[in-house]
Amino acid sequence: MTLDKVTDIYDLQKIARRRVPRMFYDYADSGAWTESTYRDNTDAFEKIKLRQRVARNIDNRSVSTTMIGHDVSIPTALAPVGMTGMQHPDGEIHAARAAEKFGVPFTLSTMSICSIEEVAKATSKPFWFQLYVMRDRGFAADLIGRAKAAGCSALVLTLDLQILAQRHKDVKNGLSAPPKPTIANLINLAFKPAWCLGMLQTQNRSFGNIVGHVKGVEDMSSLGDWTNSQFDPTLDWESVEWIKKHWDGKLILKGVNDVEDAKIAAKLGADAIIVSNHGGRQLDGAAATIDMLPPIVDAVGDQIEIHLDSGIRSGQDIFKAIALGAKSTFIGRAFVYGLGAAGEAGVTKALQLLKKELDLTMALAGETDINEVGYQNLLTPPATARKVFVPKAKPEAKAPAKPRAKPAAAKPAAAKSKTAAAAKTTAKRTTARRKPASKKTES
């Protein structure tokens, strides 16, 4: 299938599955444990039904908006995805260029294949950088400094990866640093000639932000030992304060999927949060993000900008997220499929599909401005939204109390005697009417 035949993100996924080696395709297209949350993320979007409106002027539509003050052509950004450069040679550079040309933010992962400096050299506009807080805080501070030097305009701090969840496909595929491919995966590589040729033509085949920037980490073998020991289980809200002291730009907190955590994040003064469950790759059994969005919006929507990721596969999904209160969204797998399918052109195709689907959905819902989309566009929102947004019934108005009757004035004695006599006569007549007729005795 060629790009001109592609009609949705799932078509790009099919092409990527054919072109990308199994161990790297499975890395992107998998979840933790039973993958229940991974599946729920997309299923929850499908359960939301929209109101179809007709006979409304839907000319001159606009899907452009802003994210933390940055103009964007559609309400989405490319999410940080580790090892993007293994989906396609120099993958981060291809994705960043596509995002820049399309007018949406690109977020580079700490665990990228291409380094911060390489992506900055290949692009002309600021991109965003995602940070994992490592045990080696000196290295974390160095990463922040490098992001500043590269002109990154926002820092995305990931909070939900203090410890790595088990992803069965990665274990079975031997995906590690260095990789330990199985015989089956080696055979699979033989059937991916275009990918193999492309990887031979680039020098970027390791974690570019780490190798050569950490003392003692000079190759894939030493990288594996260092990486396994660096994810920090002690990361807490005080650590976020530490990050803020080192980063004086826009700060986005990623991985919030609980109301109480959202409240804490808002109090810390971050510019935005991303309602996220890491695409179902961390806590299997966690709630779908679109289900958690309404109560989080209700709790802190007036205090902080709210974005959402996990489960978005179409422009209609973006529309539903906006209708439920998100300012914007992040896409991960949706752009990774495009990247694996056709590099920069594939990412551009993914963004074009999302924009077209978003625009058509908005039009058929009777709206012309994405910034005006809201709860009024939903017919059957998630149960969590119904609890939050449905107006509470007003208490029924009580009937006005009747005024107490004033006590009657005392009647003179003569009047009393006449009244008593009249009552006595009336009683006799009533008794006479009620007296049954006499019956004859049966023989």
Task: Enumerate the predicted regions with their spans.
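Glycine-rich active-site/cofactor-binding loop and its immediate structural neighborhood
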Residues: 72-111, 116
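Intrinsically disordered, polybasic Lys/Arg-rich low-complexity tracts
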Residues: 392-443
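Alpha/beta catalytic cores of nucleotide-metabolism and tRNA/nucleoside-modifying enzymes
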Residues: 1-46, 291-309, 313-398
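A gly/proline- and charged-residue-enriched helix-loop-helix capping module
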Residues: 101-122, 126-140
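Short, conserved glycine- and acidic-residue-centered signature motifs
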Residues: 92, 286-289, 347
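An N-cap/entry alpha-helix motif that binds or orients negatively charged groups
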Residues: 1-69, 174, 178-235, 372-392
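Alpha/beta enzyme core
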Residues: 83, 97, 118, 122, ...
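Short, conserved beta-strand segments within well-ordered enzyme catalytic domains
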Residues: 49, 64-66, 75-79, 105-109, ...
